[in-house]
Structures are given as structure tokens and as C-alpha cells.
């Protein structure tokens, strides 16, 4: 089994939060699920620049960490829906605060991030 050379520091709450919600599309997924977009195909349409494989991987990670729940309906064709858990709902306030911070400093960081490689 693969073992990371540098173990994750889980003694800090911030590191744990970043580990759970730190993914390129996780904040978008959580915001869209909160808006009522619950099916994987709808989530992919709402984030077209992300591949379905990556979105499914990140949804699986969010489910594993207890941030979202996945409900599989027993119908044909199969129907899957995601919803936020109480942990997922509680992280929204943090995500929206980060969004507000980003909006406030957008001009400051836009050029730096644009040319960051």
C-alpha cells in the first residue's frame, strides 16, 4: 500500500478543513447542491469545464467525509441525487465568506493568479 512520505498534519483544524473541502470543484459542487442541483448530470452541466470523472471523484470524497449524502433511487434508468448533510450546510457559511473575500481582493490578485503558470 502506498504511504505518503510526508504525513498529513491533522492537528490543525484549518488543515482538516482544507483536506475535506480543498478540491478544484468542491466549492462549486457544494454551492450548486445547496441551490437545488442534485443529480450528477445537472452538476456536470453547471460546471461544464470539469470532466465528469473529476466531478464524480470529488463527489465521492465529499460523501466519504460526510459533507454530502448520495441517494440512489431504485428506478430504471438509475437515478442518483446528492444533498448536503448538516456538516455540508455548516461549511457553506465559510465558503461564502471566502467568496466575499475573493470578491474584495479580485483586482489585487487577478493579474498575479493569471500569470502564475
Language model features with spans:
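Acidic-glycine-rich active-site phosphate/pyrophosphate-binding loop
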Residues: 1-7
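Amphipathic alpha-helical dimerization/coiled-coil segments
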Residues: 2, 31, 89-117
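N-terminal helix-turn-helix DNA-binding core of bacterial DNA-binding proteins
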Residues: 8-54, 74, 81
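Residues within the DNA-recognition helix of helix-turn-helix
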Residues: 58
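Short beta-strand His + acidic residue motifs that chelate non-heme Fe in jelly-roll/DSBH
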Residues: 71
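Basic, amphipathic "hinge/linker" alpha-helix immediately C-terminal to the N-terminal HTH DNA-binding motif
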Residues: 74-98
Amino acid at each position: 500500500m502506498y504511504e505518503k512520505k510526508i504525513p498529513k498534519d491533522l492537528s490543525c483544524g484549518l488543515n482538516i478543513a482544507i483536506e475535506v473541502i480543498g478540491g478544484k470543484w468542491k466549492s462549486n459542487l457544494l454551492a450548486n447542491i445547496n441551490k437545488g442541483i442534485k443529480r450528477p448530470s445537472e452538476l456536470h452541466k453547471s460546471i461544464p469545464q470539469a470532466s465528469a470523472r473529476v466531478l464524480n471523484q470529488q463527489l465521492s470524497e465529499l460523501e466519504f467525509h460526510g459533507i454530502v449524502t448520495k441517494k440512489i433511487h431504485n428506478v430504471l434508468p438509475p437515478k442518483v441525487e446528492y444533498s448536503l448533510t448538516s456538516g455540508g450546510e455548516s461549511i457553506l457559511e465559510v465558503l461564502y465568506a471566502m467568496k466575499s473575500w475573493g470578491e474584495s481582493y479580485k483586482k489585487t490578485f487577478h493579474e498575479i493568479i493569471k500569470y502564475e503558470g
